[in-house]
Amino acid sequence: MAPKTKSRLVDQPPSASSSEEQELVEESQEEEEQQSREEEGEEESGEETEEDEEPKTAHPVVKKPISQKLVQTPQKPQFSSESGSENGSGSDSEAESGNSLPSPSASDFTVKPNVAAKAATPSKPAAKRPQEAQKEKGKKKPKIAEEEEKKSPATPRSLWSDDDQLALLKGILEYKTVKGMEPSADMSAFHEFIRGKLQAEVSKSQISDKVRRLKKKFLTNVKDGEEPVFKKGQDFLIFEHSKRIWGAPGISNGGVKDNVNNTSNGKAKKTVEVKKSSEPKKSAKVSKPKDDEKQKEEEQQVAVKEVVKEDIVKGDQQDFQSKYPRLAASLETMSGLSTMYPNGSSLLKENMSLIATDKAKVLEEKWKKLEDDEAALMVKRLDFIAEHYRLVVDAMRGN
């Protein structure tokens, strides 16, 4: 009875193994079809993730260990012929199972994900917008307007121009000659007198302050007893008119120059000469270029002074003729003077302004009286001529 039980055990495994292999083949085919379908679905969609693919690949269940156990069962020796035949059939089944296709393993059916792991690229900083870049450039640029505001404000323009200063000095001289009094005695009258001759609108206080400063400037210039050197002709004109108003240096202001010249013992001159003689010769050699430059400057100053003096003379002549028109016209009536003295009329015209103002006034009044007398005489003469002609006409008519 024992051999029969053994033969049953040997006969059962081949049938079981063949059915299992067939099931495995069918499952493998189904899995291949399913895999192909999944690949087609992935190609169509292209958006499936790794999480969706992992459960699908976990379906195949391989029951390979059962066949391995059947193959690896030890064969016991059979003592009967039946056992030998059975053994032969068992060996045949084993041979058939050996010749059959190997059962697929679970690793053969695992689907590897095709999705490549993207390398984490470092995020680049976003490019700045053009508006932000322009704003930053605008911040970096220096603000010229702010720098200009920080600068110190421009100096205010001077109220008194050189022409107005000169006109003020001329007005003082004219006012003194016409009114015979100082402008400071009646500033209201002088303000009305001078305001039409100035370009700027000034008040009485501004005029008095300017006169005071001009006088102070003149006295400072003549303090050393020497005439200062001017770079502009206008400054020299102002100085000359100031001299005519407030006096020459050394006369009314006690200049050093006149005091030195008037000294009886001449000590001041000697001290100056001693200083000059005590200077070393080397310093004299070194100072030659300076002396040349100084000499050139003095020559230029002399030329400027001559030109300015000519302008002063011309200006004085025009002012004199405007103040005393009868004196100027009197030269034209002196026709006989040119025959007696050819250069007499031109000489009088050039030097007429040198006459003192009080004497010029007297001459002007005399010429005016003479013109009035001449006019009255002309009327008498015309009346006499008319009477003479009337008598002649009446005589011719026989009356």
Curated annotation (Swiss-Prot):
User: Does the record carry Transcription as a key word?
Assistant: yes
Using the UniProt annotation, give all residue ranges assigned to the region (Disordered): 1-160, 250-301
Biased composition regions of type Basic and acidic residues, renumbered to the chain:
143-152, 270-299
Signal peptide extent: none
Q: Where in the cell is it found?
A: Nucleus
GO CC terms of this entry? nucleus
| Acidic residues bias locations | 20-54
Q: What is its main location?
A: nucleus
Any one biological process term the GO annotation gives: regulation of DNA-templated transcription
Provide ranges: composition bias, Polar residues. Answer: 69-79
Summary of the tissues where the protein is detected: Expressed in tubers and in leaves treated with sucrose.
Q: Which family does it belong to?
A: Belongs to the GeBP family.
What is this protein called in UniProt? STOREKEEPER protein
UniProt source species: Solanum tuberosum (Potato)
Q: What is the lineage of its organism?
A: Eukaryota, Viridiplantae, Streptophyta, Embryophyta, Tracheophyta
What gene codes for this chain? STK
